[in-house]
Swiss-Prot record:
This is Gamma-1-syntrophin. InterPro entries: PDZ, PDZ_sf, PH_domain, Syntrophin, Syntrophin_4th. Belongs to the syntrophin family. It comes from the Eukaryota. The gene is SNTG1. It comes from Homo sapiens. One of its GO terms (molecular function) is actin binding. Residues 57-140 form the PDZ domain. Brain specific. In CNS, it is expressed in the perikaryon and proximal portion of the neuronal processes. Strong expression in the hippocampus, neuron-rich dendate granule cells, and pyramidal cell layers. Highly expressed in neurons of the cerebral cortex. Also expressed in the cerebellar cortex, deep cerebellar nuclei, thalamus, and basal ganglia. No expression in muscle cells. Residues 283-390 form the PH domain. GO terms for biological process: cell communication.
Length: 517
């Protein structure tokens, strides 16, 4: 039932939808470039201006072969009316053009059967005479357990046999034909067409979900419990699809990937438009939803939706996507991108059953734990974080931190071009300098002290330098960011991808500290 266009921007297929406490029912999903449509079947009048049906009255005559030409399912034992489950080709019901699979039978010859059990309705139809007048209304959300066909092109062969038993979950059709005085011999072609109104079964929009800044999840909200072959999509305004149940695991993955692709494309296009209004050093590199794991294990909701953005020098953590310039000033948290550490978690590092996770360690040493839905989402985040870090390091070129050496106030500059420079804070006199390549190892006490192990270029001996910082994690992460940027400079593929951004970033004004030797 599904297909994709060459650009993979559209997809259509049949799924089940569970909306609240209702039984799942069949819907059609249609994915367009910027919207997800959920459609349900309804019967509408198409003569003149289309309008939706309420109750319709249908009169059909019994035939010698095939009877009324319909089968039924359901009943009060399942808290639903009896519904038409099959319509025989070239039989009375089919030729009338007024009866459809999914029609709930409300009255039979004026007898109210809305709350009748299946067998009771069967008996009423068997004893209805040669002509029966049905009051029907299309049951748009027929429970999936009825397994109704989506259209009238189903095999339901006519028969003149009768059956004495019926089941509400099986098609009761053959035993509806019994009528002792039936002498009808009219041919199918002699059945008159219905004058006046003409009805058709169509797919009608039930819910429309704009994809820009929307999010989707396979997990039960707030937990690490994944639904089997099911997901939901939530629009930026909070409108939710309900739980969409796919027919197979493969089908579910296809839908999720297609939705993720369209959301990603919309986000990239939106970022380009927004970046026109921001200077070079304030460009957005990434925007997207994830779920943050609460640090308090006693919380009822372990995970909560979080919107992350990488812009300029900062990682922003929002409760909702920023729309205006003012929104960017109201982030829940903000971090300097070169002073934090991002780690993609292996299976052995995961805290629960969620698979695609990463952590961000802040400049204060706080660990933030995040989860995304797809492996491709995780890869996209990792690339974006590397890009944002590289661009910011390339822009600032150097960073200086206050430190203490043997009770003396010093400064340590991490310079992208020259490496490490330690100088006296008062006199600016340089005590020592080393290139990045000379750093052979380091260790820290987790509180304030870092011991650097540098190799002397002349003696080849290892020289230990210990410094004390008030912001240990910020320094460690900054060193890591500068090293990562150095490594990225050796990767032709990375540099090729960043050529445009790097050129723009290098044109920005940068300031460097001056030293005396």
């Amino acid at each position: 039932m599904d297909f994709r266009t060459a650009c993979e921007e559209t997809k259509t297929g049949i799924c089940l939808l569970q909306d609240g406490n209702q039984e799942p029912f069949k819907v059609r999903l249609h994915l367009a470039k910027d919207i997800l449509m959920i459609q349900e079947q309804d019967v509408i009048c198409v003569s003149g201006e289309p309008f939706y049906s309420g109750e319709r009255t249908v009169t059909i005559r019994r035939q010698t072969v095939g009877g009324f030409g319909l089968s039924i399912k359901g009943g009060a034992e399942h808290n639903i009316p009896v519904v038409v489950s099959k319509i025989s080709k070239e039989q009375r019901a089919e030729l009338s053009g007024l009866l459809f699979i999914g029609d709930a039978i409300l009255q039979i010859n004026g007898i109210n059967v809305r709350k009748c059990r299946h067998e009771e309705v069967v008996q009423v139809l068997r004893n209805a005479g040669e002509e029966v007048t049905l009051t029907v209304s299309f049951l748009k959300r027929a429970p999936a357990f009825l397994k109704l066909p989506l259209n009238e092109d189903c095999a339901c062969a006519p028969s003149d046999q009768s059956s004495g038993t019926s089941s509400p979950l099986c098609d009761s059709g053959l035993h509806l034909n019994y009528h002792p005085n039936n002498t009808d011999t009219l041919s199918c072609s002699s059945w008159p067409t219905s004058p006046g109104l003409r009805w058709e079964k169509r797919w009608c929009d039930l819910r429309l979900i704009p994809l820009l800044h929307s999010r989707f999840s396979q997990y039960v909200p707030g937990t690490d419990l994944s639904r089997q072959n099911a997901f939901q999509v939530i629009a930026v305004d909070g409108v939710c699809t309900g739980i969409i149940q796919c027919l197979s695991a493969e089908d579910c993955v296809d839908w999720l990937q297609a939705i993720a692709t369209n959301i990603s494309n919309l986000t990239k296009h939106n970022i380009k438009k927004i970046n026109r209004n921001f200077p070079v050093n304030q460009q957005i590199v990434y925007m997207g939803w994830c779920e943050a794991r609460e640090q308090d294990p006693l919380q009822d909701r372990v995970y909560s939706p979080t919107f992350l953005a990488l812009r300029g020098s900062c990682l922003y953590k929002f409760l909702a996507p920023p729309v205006t310039t003012w929104d960017w000033t109201r982030a829940e948290k903000t971090f300097s991108v070169y002073e934090i550490m991002c780690k993609i978690l292996k299976d052995s590092d995961l805290l629960d059953r969620r698979k695609q996770c990463f952590t961000v360690q802040s400049e204060s040493g706080e660990d933030l734990y995040f989860s995304v839905e797809l492996e491709s989402d995780l890869a996209q985040w990792e690339r974006a974080f590397q890009t944002a870090t590289f661009l910011e390091v390339e822009r600032i070129q150097c960073k200086t931190y206050a430190c203490v050496l043997e009770s003396h106030l010093m400064g340590l500059t991490i310079d992208f071009s020259t490496g490490f420079i330690c100088f006296d804070a008062a006199t600016k006199a340089v005590l020592w300098r080393y290139k990045f390549s000379q750093l052979k190892g380091s260790s820290d006490d987790g509180k304030s002290k870092i011991k650097f192990l540098f190799q002397n270029p002349d003696t080849k001996q290892i020289e230990a330098k210990e410094l004390e910082f008030s912001n240990l994690f910020a320094v460690l992460h900054c060193i890591h960011s500068f090293f990562a940027a150095k490594v990225a400079c050796l990767d032709p593929l990375f540099l090729g991808n960043q050529a445009t951004a790097s050129t723009a970033a290098s044109s920005a004004t940068t300031s460097k500290a001056k030293y005396t030797t």
